[in-house]
Amino acid sequence: MSIAIIGAGNVGMALGQALVARGESVIFGVPDPGKYREAVARLGSKASIGATAAAVGAGEVVILAVPYAAAQGVARSVADWGQKILVDATNPLAPALAGLSLGTTTSGAEQVAAAAHGARVVKAFNTTGAENMADSGYSGGRIFMPVCGDDADARSKIVALVSSLGFDGVDAGPLAAARYL
């Protein structure tokens, strides 16, 4: 499977490292590919980097790993997602990490879905830190990772992907459940 990761910060790089270690091909999409070229090259031959639009075009699954403030803009920047699975790994954190910037009547994932025309949006990878994404192994067992989205097939594929990375992937139901993740 070809996976695009939009963003090359802590979360994006940790997920990329874990995915490449599992044999997946990963293309990172960022506004300035030159800035991250060396870091991506260290991940090996299965990792590459390009502009955001090129990465979205190349990925069967696209993981959104940018700050929440940029998420809707990235989602809107693609005219038609063409039924690609868009995994929202963001958290709508308030300034100074003082809680969430949204209440319980909507979620960041629902807002991303509204901005991402034609995407099958799934929420995942937002309930643990980047250090756990790079290495999900614990002596006490697997880390619980809820996955929610309105498209059952997309949810199923991402539960399988999450599980392949060593997490205990769990189908958490429709995208509205992201309000509580």
Language-model features, listed with the residues they occupy:
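NAD(P)+-binding Rossmann beta1-loop-alpha1 motif at the extreme N-terminus of oxidoreductases
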Residues: 1-42
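Residues that mark the start of a beta-strand
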Residues: 1-2, 85, 144
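Short beta-strand "acidic-cap" motif of Rossmann-like dinucleotide-binding folds
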Residues: 26-28, 86, 171
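Rossmann-like NAD(P)-binding element
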Residues: 44-96
